[in-house]
Design a protein with these regions (language model features):
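Short beta-strand scaffold segments in enzyme catalytic cores
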Residues: 74-78
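C-terminal segment of N-terminal export signals and the immediately downstream linker at the start
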Residues: 22-59, 79
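Metal-dependent enolase-superfamily TIM-barrel catalytic cores that perform enediolate-based chemistry
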Residues: 162-196
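N-terminal export signals
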Residues: 6-28
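Metal- or metallocofactor-binding catalytic centers and their adjacent structured scaffolds
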Residues: 41-45, 50, 79, 84-157
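Glycine-rich, charged/polar anion/phosphate-binding loops
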Residues: 60-63, 162
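N-terminal secretory signal peptides
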Residues: 1-3
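Short Gly/Pro-enriched turn/cap motifs at secondary-structure boundaries
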Residues: 64-69
């Protein structure tokens, strides 16, 4: 059975059809020009930035116990060699026990910001995410945002979307689901049409 790192090496190799030894990319050795990695030729390091904001909803979101028009959110950016990957930590009030609050997410991301530069490159996904997970229990939204930003960054560096890296057919991807809040029948029909 392949571990995550070996799978990424194999998948990247297959997706890009390269005859270059993929181990060079992941071992931090000289990087083939095929990849969009360390193009500046300097000792690139990852940098994490994060920006809190209030996500304004298009419609009032109502469930049995409350209504809201906003959701606390944090945008996460991980930059490496001039390329930026994006992630997001969303904390709807009814999930804050599991996901964290704005304050806990910001404090957790500050911890990650202080240590992410110790990893030589974003291709060490398994090691980085294991380290991030051990920083503190909980804070699932912040951890997910870092995970998403790292995957976005690696996909950009490999110049391939993840469905190709994983060898998937995007047309066969299952539909996603989400909650349409309680409203009048007319508004629920309108929201449903918007989502179709």
């Amino acid at each position: 059975m392949q571990n995550r790192r070996d799978f990424l090496k194999t998948a990247a190799f297959a997706a890009l059809g390269s005859s270059v030894a993929i181990n060079n990319v992941f071992a931090g050795e000289s990087t083939p020009s095929l990849f969009n990695i360390n193009k500046s030729g300097v000792n690139a390091r990852m940098k994490l930035r994060f920006f809190p904001y209030e996500l304004k909803l298009r419609h009032v979101f109502t469930v049995a116990t409350y209504s809201r028009t906003t959701t606390p959110d944090v945008q996460v950016e991980i930059e490496y060699d001039g390329i930026t990957g994006y992630g997001e930590a969303s904390m709807p009030p009814y999930l804050q026990k599991e996901l964290g609050t704005m304050e806990s997410v910001m404090a957790f991301l500050k911890k990650v910001q202080d240590v992410i530069g110790q990893f030589p490159d974003p291709f060490q996904l398994e090691d980085i995410l294991a380290y991030v997970d051990k920083l503190s229990p909980g804070d699932a939204a912040a951890k997910a945002a870092v995970d998403i930003a790292l995957h976005d960054l690696v996909g950009k560096l490999l110049q391939a979307p993840w469905y190709k890296i994983w060898g998937l057919d995007k047309d066969k991807a299952p539909s996603t689901t989400f909650t349409i809040g309680i409203d009048t029948p007319e508004v629920v029909r309108e929201k449903t049409k918007e989502c179709a």
